[in-house]
């Protein structure tokens, strides 16, 4: 499973959305109807899965699925 697939699977599970709705351009709030609690839980799950901490400042910048994928790729390299 690719990083992109892993991230999308986590988002589907955490937000209860359809896999077809999770695109790199999807906004968590506008397109996937996430609220602040959803986003906090999503960040915690991503931190656990990928074994690094996401600062509050960084988390605020992660607005789309693509933002998260790019952020994790940068942290892993």
Curated annotation (Swiss-Prot):
GO annotation terms (biological process): lipid A biosynthetic process
InterPro entries: ACP, ACP-like_sf, PP-bd_ACP, Ppantetheine_attach_site
Compartments where located: Cytoplasm
Family: Belongs to the acyl carrier protein (ACP) family.
PANTHER family assigned: ACYL CARRIER PROTEIN, CARRIER DOMAIN-CONTAINING PROTEIN
GO cellular component: cytosol; membrane
SUPFAM superfamilies named among the record's database cross-references: ACP-like
Organism taxonomic ancestry: Bacteria, Pseudomonadati, Chlamydiota, Chlamydiia, Chlamydiales
Keyword Protease: no
Residues of the Carrier domain: 1-76
Extent of the signal sequence: none
Keyword Ribonucleoprotein (UniProt): no
UniProt xrefs under Gene3D superfamilies: ACP-like (1.10.1200.10)
Organism for this UniProt entry: Chlamydia muridarum (strain MoPn / Nigg)
O-(pantetheine 4'-phosphoryl)serine found at: 36
PTM remark: 4'-phosphopantetheine is transferred from CoA to a specific serine of apo-ACP by AcpS. This modification is essential for activity because fatty acids are bound in thioester linkage to the sulfhydryl of the prosthetic group.
Pathway membership, UniProt: Lipid metabolism; fatty acid biosynthesis
Functional description taken from the UniProt entry: Carrier of the growing fatty acid chain in fatty acid biosynthesis.
Gene Ontology MF term list: acyl binding; acyl carrier activity
Name by which UniProt lists this protein: Acyl carrier protein
Keywords, comma-separated and alphabetical: Cytoplasm, Fatty acid biosynthesis, Fatty acid metabolism, Lipid biosynthesis, Lipid metabolism, Phosphopantetheine, Phosphoprotein
């Amino acid at each position: 499973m690719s990083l992109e697939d892993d991230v999308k699977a986590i988002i589907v599970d955490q937000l209860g959305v359809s896999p077809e709705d999770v695109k790199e351009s999807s906004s968590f709030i506008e397109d996937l109807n996430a609220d602040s609690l959803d986003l906090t839980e999503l960040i915690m799950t991503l931190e656990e899965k990928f074994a690094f901490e996401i600062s509050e400042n960084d988390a605020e910048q992660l607005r789309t699925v693509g933002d998260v994928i790019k952020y994790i790729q940068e942290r892993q390299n």
